[in-house]
Amino acid sequence: MKRAILIIASILGFFSVLIGAMGAHYFSDYLVLVDRVNTFETAVRFQFYHTFFLFFLGLSYDFTNIKLLRYAFLVCVTGIILFSGSLYVLCLTNISFFGIITPFGGILLMFSWLIYLYSLMK
């Protein structure tokens, strides 16, 4: 599982850089037109921040509660998908419905940090 966490963190890190570059170069005119540049940058930034969090989870695997660490990992990945993913879709389609999903992803991201904290204290 440790290796899987680090691999998924690497993949998500790669995609955060790729998506950020696409937003800056390929989608920039459209994002300006629909006034979603800041929203897109927030999605990329949060994905990138939580990629590092996933690396910490993977590197913590040997000295913390493995069951809780797995929960933190799954909750974090789900949070990234819901938070950043919904913002990416919102920005690129300009369909406001996807904005409803974003807070649920944010809550999961916060919850993943709390699960990790609890795993360290246990």
PLM feature segments, named:
Residues 1-122:
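Polytopic transmembrane helical bundles with strong interfacial aromatic enrichment
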